[in-house]
Amino acid sequence: FVPEGAGVRVAPFSMPLRPTALSRAVSPHPFVPDDAALRRKRAELLLSIQAHGLRKRLLHTGSRAALLPVTDDLDSVLALLVCARTMDLLGRARHDVLAVTQPGGDRARVLRLCKALGVSVRPNADRAGLARTHAALPLAAPDFTALLLGEAVCAPEAYGVNAAVPRTLVRWLIAAEAERAEEPLRAELRAALSAPDADCAGISCALTDFCFYHLVRCGAHPRRILRLARAAFGDAAADADILRAMAALTRCLFRRPAALPDHVALGSSAQALHWPPDAAGSLWGEEIDALRRELT
């Protein structure tokens, strides 16, 4: 602010604000590289990090086996792939992976995948007893997005194989592994990806990952995220859906502490949340409410 006087002339004016289109493309899946070659390279790197992280935990705890509860969802598929890689790194037999099938879902598909990978299968059983008998490390398969939103929980003693993997990235990691796999594993992975219930990254999860990325990686506020999401998703996501995803993310980040299991960190988006339990999200909530009022 410059006061009048002292040779200063103030000339008030006004001009209309016009919305301008973004001059760059915005990806709806910021965790997934757009370039196919880079995507394959990144997938190999992330899978390798996951496997080496699990290898370190097995060696550190002196575990002779890995105990993984599995269903027919893509989180379980990815966790099985990581476990198989880990045993290869350790020079151990893949039978040291104890896959415990859970009730529900397509159990036959789970059994075929386990057979193709060469891992041991146990029916729904006493996991604590199995862990003691085989000196096995308890594992958990839920991805980062499910844990962040509270859709899944892990036992305190479990190691989260996918706890740093956003849900929108799970499918691409499995697809990259399917490209390099041989039969019959390739067929089983493609069957898992094409299953009717395999769309684990619907629009709501894609919006959650999108909002989280731009909040943590870029420090964007709700109004900016809304504009970016409009450009990224177009007609696939209404403004109300975007604001709903931001509100859910706000509740999860600020109103309850994140309960993530032990896991290896991936990427540079601070997905391994060390979120202060007394953090307040009032500014975010107020801006989201203001945006809702503007749109009504």
Q: Which role does the model predict for each range below?
A:
Residues 1-72, 76-296:
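ATP/NTP-dependent adenylation/nucleotidyl-transfer catalytic domains that generate, transfer
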